[in-house]
Every structure is written in structure tokens, then in C-alpha cells.
């Protein structure tokens, strides 16, 4: 199972049902459960991470705010943004948390490089940046040696809701996206490149694709 990966393409989804399904998957997985990556575009929502502070919500207006249990502070999700959730058994992969963060950042950097977009990570603020402007946010949670939550890569979206918050707790943090650097404007194209890079970086040999929505069981 160490080299097997299931990739689920979930399409457009509200945040909370997917969040609850991630919890359930992580709670129920065993040592034999293959790792999964869930690819999704969320309907408009602000999510507060565990370090989130109310003062970073400037004017949320009609966009809902959800208190999440991922690391980090506030961010925005909306259509045209690629969200990837990494449900990985870190012990089985022999990865530490810092290793996983670095791997995810490199995953995005390599994906953007395929479109001739030069980007970099920052030691003081997780995520990926182009000329100091944020193109990808990152927030994770670890339970029972397994990760959940993940990244949000801006592809071709309305960035104005980011002006209603201090993204990731940084006042004036400018957000950018793939399409403005002559990269693809459709999320699906970027998804394919991202998964190719992930399979290489984390040494998966068997990859199964699915559009089946994750089960939420009886959780409310």
C-alpha cells in the first residue's frame, strides 16, 4: 500500500461536507488503507485555521466563514481554485511533518515550472510565492500519523474576496494566480500536472482515479 495512491476528483463542493468526510476517512483508515488525494473546487467560503484571529476577517460580507482545524490562519476558497487534500500515512511513507510541507511546496513549484512560472517557498510563511506574491496557500493537520487538509492553488478565479481578509494573517498580502502568468486557465489541466509531480515526488507506483464522492457516514 506504500506505493498505491487513489486520486478522487470531486468537482464543485461545499467546504463542510468534504471537511467532515476527511475526518471520517482519517478516523477509519487502517495501516492497509491506500493513501488518497482529493481534488476539489469549493463554493465561496472563508476558512479560519487553528491560528486564525478574528481581526484578520475584515469584511466577509455574504461569504460564509467556517472554523477549520487545519494549521494556519484565514484563507479564501472559491471556483477556479484547485484545492488538493492529502490523506497520507506519514509513518508508512517515513515522512515527518516538515518533510511533507516541503514536499507539497516543491510539488507546486514543479507544477508551476512546467508552465514557465518561477515560484518559491518562504521560510517564514508556508505556501508558494511568485515574486513575493502568494499563489498557493497551505494548511495541514496530522492525526494518528496521517495527514489531512492540504493546499489551495489559485488558477483562474475571482481574487477580490481575498481583499476582505488578511490572507494567512498577513495584512496587505497580494494574491496572484496561474492564469495571469500565461499558465492554463482551467483547473483540470493543472490538476493533471500536479498529480504527475506528486507521483514522482512521493514514489507512487499504482495510481487509481475515481470521481466517487467520499462517504460521510452518519456524521452530522
Curated annotation (Swiss-Prot):
What PANTHER family does the record point to?
Answer: LIPOYLTRANSFERASE 2, MITOCHONDRIAL-RELATED (PTHR10993:SF7), OCTANOYLTRANSFERASE (PTHR10993)
Q: What does this protein do?
A: Catalyzes the transfer of endogenously produced octanoic acid from octanoyl-acyl-carrier-protein onto the lipoyl domains of lipoate-dependent enzymes. Lipoyl-ACP can also act as a substrate although octanoyl-ACP is likely to be the physiological substrate.
What organism is the protein native to?
Vibrio parahaemolyticus serotype O3:K6 (strain RIMD 2210633)
Indicate whether Transcription regulation appears among the record's keywords: no
One GO cellular component this record assigns the protein to is:
cytoplasm
Where does the protein end up? Cytoplasm
What's one GO MF term for it?
lipoyl(octanoyl) transferase activity
SUPFAM superfamilies for this protein: Class II aaRS and biotin synthetases
Show the InterPro entries listed in the entry: aa-tRNA-synth_II/BPL/LPL, BPL_LPL_catalytic, Octanoyltransferase, Octanoyltransferase_CS
So, what pathway does this thing act in? Answer: Protein modification; protein lipoylation via endogenous pathway; protein N(6)-(lipoyl)lysine from octanoyl-[acyl-carrier-protein]: step 1/2
Q: What else is known?
A: In the reaction, the free carboxyl group of octanoic acid is attached via an amide linkage to the epsilon-amino group of a specific lysine residue of lipoyl domains of lipoate-dependent enzymes.
The name this protein goes by in its record: Octanoyltransferase
**Where primarily located?**
cytoplasm
Q: Which residues form the BPL/LPL catalytic domain?
A: 31-206
Tagged with keyword Transferase: yes
Which reaction is recorded as catalysed by this protein?
Answer: octanoyl-[ACP] + L-lysyl-[protein] = N(6)-octanoyl-L-lysyl-[protein] + holo-[ACP] + H(+)
In Gene Ontology terms, what is a biological process of this protein?
A: protein modification process
What keywords are assigned to this protein?
Acyltransferase, Cytoplasm, Transferase
According to the UniProt entry, the coiled-coil residues are none
The record's similarity note reads:
Belongs to the LipB family.
